Regions:
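N-terminal alpha-helical interaction blocks
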Residues: 1-16
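Residues immediately within or flanking Cys/His clusters that coordinate Zn2+
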Residues: 25, 44
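Short cysteine-rich clusters marking metal-coordination/redox-active sites
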Residues: 28-31, 47-50
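Cys/His-rich microdomains that often coordinate metals
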Residues: 34-35, 53-54
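Long, charge-rich boundary regions
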Residues: 56-129
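Glycine-rich anion/phosphate-binding loops
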Residues: 99-105, 130-145
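A structural preference for short, pocket-lining loop segments at secondary-structure junctions
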Residues: 113-123, 139-163
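Conserved catalytic cores of soluble enzyme domains
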Residues: 158-276
Length: 287
């Protein structure tokens, strides 16, 4: 006779293990907050915990600012050559194009913002750090020329480490070329709005980025010409905390406003209507 008896209970079916896709969650690189990747996307790549503004791709920013179904891209066939015969530059261009899915570090397009036509250039940091070479300069110059011809306001969204060293002086020439055509916009009283995102540095900050009739910046964006270590070594003294952030520049009169990404389209729409003398569209007058 057995001392112990095991009750025979009906076995429960084993639940199928839930497979979570590896890209279902995302992590903020500022505060470390982990959340659903979909939540970051819905929040325009702004951390729901600390409000850190992550970098956007150029095509993503176009869809944020332009009215639905109005985007017409320009000069997508322009590609950088290798005029100086810089070692491995063609290979770097091919790698950057394959990785970023773009032909160079800027997208230019025409569309409608709050019902008003506008030309926009959006720099893409994913392509060689958003560096400004001959193609970037040419596309901005052509876009500004379109604004001159059609009297459309111009917007340029900057995200760049500066001039592209592989093109040497030809890259530096773009600063003067773009600045010259922007001066023509000023003479014709055609609005130019510059939007600074993280980072906006080097030759870009020394040219078109700081020439806007209105200069807006995203929160926490790093904006400056040289890096803090270079400046500290040159001056031989300590620098103020956060002296290259958009908030610091706002306090010292270098930018006109720091605008949250979710409010950028509304603010730009209000600026365009104010500059053009047109009344605010329905639903856009508040804020």
């Amino acid at each position: 006779m057995a001392w112990f008896r095991k009750d025979k209970k009906p076995r429960q079916p084993v639940r199928q293990r839930l497979e979570i896709p590896p890209d279902a969650f995302d992590k903020c690189d500022q505060c470390g907050h982990t959340d659903l990747a979909e939540k970051f996307v819905r929040n325009l790549e702004v951390c729901p915990n600390c409000d850190h503004h992550r970098r956007l791709r150029a095509n993503e920013y176009l869809t944020i600012l332009f009215d639905d179904g109005t985007i017409v891209e320009h000069d997508s066939d322009l590609r950088s050559a290798d005029p100086l015969g810089f070692p491995d530059y063609p290979a770097r261009l091919r790698k950057a194009s394959a990785s970023a899915g773009e032909t160079d570090a800027i997208l230019t397009a025409t569309g409608m913002i709050d019902g008003l036509p506008a030309n926009i250039g959006v720099m893409d940091f994913a392509f060689m750090g958003g560096s400004m070479g001959s193609v970037v300069g040419e596309k901005i110059a052509r876009l500004a020329q379109r604004s001159l011809e059609r009297k459309y306001p111009l917007l340029v969204i900057s995200a760049s480490g500066g001039a592209r060293m592989q093109e040497g002086v030809l890259s530096l020439m773009q600063m003067a070329k773009v600045s010259a055509v922007l001066a023509q916009l000023g003479e014709r009283r055609i609005p130019y709005i510059s939007i600074l995102t993280n980072p906006t540095t080097g030759g870009v900050s020394a040219s078109h980025a700081m020439l806007g009739d209105a200069i807006l910046a995203e929160p926490g964006a790093v904006i400056g010409f040289a890096g803090p270590r270079v400046i500290k070594q040159t001056l031989g003294q300590d620098l103020p905390e956060g002296f290259q952030t958009s908030e610091f520049l706002l306090e010292h009169g270098m930018v006109d406003d720091v605008v949250h990404r979710k409010d950028m389209k509304r603010v730009v729409g209000q600026l365009l209507r104010h500059m053009s003398g047109k009344p605010a569209a329905a639903g856009w007058a508040q804020g």
